[in-house]
């Protein structure tokens, strides 16, 4: 269908695992996914027993698709995606192509990412919005079809169920900090808005393209919540570039100050000799310490942390496990509250 994947273009280290299915029951196209993760009040929704059984029965079919071409207008020192000042024009049929691919694959969760397109007047925000909306139209149509289906052949039934509630995550550029463009994507109907801050403030000028900025990325993430409080916001940080523990903690606090819900930590791996060298290989134990600290001390709703963790890699598996954990915690808290209320009445 002429669609690009960030897995190939960015030389992701997990491509063999993801494309090979990664084992288990989860069906994986180029990354992974999750169950429904936002509710009307913007908090993590709880998975009902029925939803859990459905997820276990059907598995989670997911994909990460890179839209707006495979050529970026920026040249970050850590990234392997090819660059050009003037990439090819956008494919105006891409929203429909993505929708058709998702329909044929029977996906539950789609991660849309993209190259930067500073060459476009709206930097691709309008195109991003169209792709999200087309996917949500597909989800709505599939849901209606399932509701109208009455008896008869079960042919295609599983695909319908998989398309019944498509969760859409958008991993976006910073749109040069133009918040009206951020608004276009944030209000498109997506479920998760991701934008990667990548590294700590001190290292940003060396790691990211000069048009990117630490404060600019924080403003993007904070603005998303201001225009759509219900959406889940997410970011990713690479470790091993020379950052200090205090700088990581400061970054986590800055993210929470801007209402970011989810953070992921992964090991930076040098794509080629032309890219930044690795300063440190962080141990799995240290990654686990960062996960605990992110969730317990800084209050992130969820943190995925490990050497090979990337923005969308194993997202569904991690989220599903986390939602079960959240379920248990909130049920226990509710039971304690009810017990206290009963005791007070007595």
Residue spans for each PLM region:
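Auxiliary Fe-S-binding modules of radical SAM enzymes
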Residues: 1-55, 59-61, 106, 130-165, ...
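Local cysteine-cluster metal-coordination motifs and their immediate loop/turn environment
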Residues: 6-20, 68-83
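Core AdoMet radical
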Residues: 62-67, 77-142, 146, 161-181, ...
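Short, glycine/serine-rich, charged loops/turns that create anion-binding
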Residues: 72, 116-119, 175, 242, ...
């Amino acid at each position: 269908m002429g669609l690009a994947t960030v897995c190939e273009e960015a030389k992701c280290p997990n491509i063999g695992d993801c494309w090979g299915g990664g084992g288990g029951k989860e069906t994986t196209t180029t990354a992974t996914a999750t169950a429904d993760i936002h509710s009307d009040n913007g908090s993590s929704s709880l998975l009902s027993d029925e939803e859990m059984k459905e997820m276990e029965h059907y598995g989670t079919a997911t994909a990460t698709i890179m839209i707006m071409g495979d050529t970026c207008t920026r040249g970050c020192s850590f990234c392997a995606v090819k660059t050009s000042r003037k990439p090819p024009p956008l494919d105006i049929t891409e929203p429909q192509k993505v929708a058709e691919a998702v329909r044929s694959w029977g996906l539950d969760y789609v991660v849309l990412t993209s190259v930067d397109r500073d060459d476009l007047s709206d930097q691709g925000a309008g195109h991003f919005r169209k792709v999200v909306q087309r996917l949500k139209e597909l989800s709505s149509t599939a849901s209606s079809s399932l509701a109208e289906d009455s008896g008869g052949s079960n042919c295609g039934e599983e695909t319908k169920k998989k398309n019944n509630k498509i969760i859409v995550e958008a991993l976006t550029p910073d749109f040069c900090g133009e918040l009206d463009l951020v608004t276009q994507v944030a209000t498109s109907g997506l479920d998760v808005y991701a934008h990667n801050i990548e590294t700590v403030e001190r290292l940003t000028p060396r790691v990211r393209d000069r048009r990117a900025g630490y404060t600019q990325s924080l403003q993007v993430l904070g603005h998303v919540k201001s225009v759509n409080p219900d959406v889940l916001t997410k970011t990713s940080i690479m470790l091993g570039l020379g950052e200090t523990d205090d700088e990581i903690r400061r970054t986590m606090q800055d993210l929470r100050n801007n209402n970011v819900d989810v953070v992921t930590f992964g090991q930076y791996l040098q794509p080629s000799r032309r890219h930044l060298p690795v300063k440190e290989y962080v141990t799995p134990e240290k990654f686990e310490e960062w996960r605990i600290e992110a969730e317990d001390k800084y209050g992130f709703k969820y943190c995925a942390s490990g050497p090979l963790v990337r923005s969308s890699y194993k997202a569904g598996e991690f989220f599903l496990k986390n939602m079960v954990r959240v379920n248990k915690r909130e049920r226990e808290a509710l039971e304690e509250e009810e017990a206290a209320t009963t005791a007070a009445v007595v």
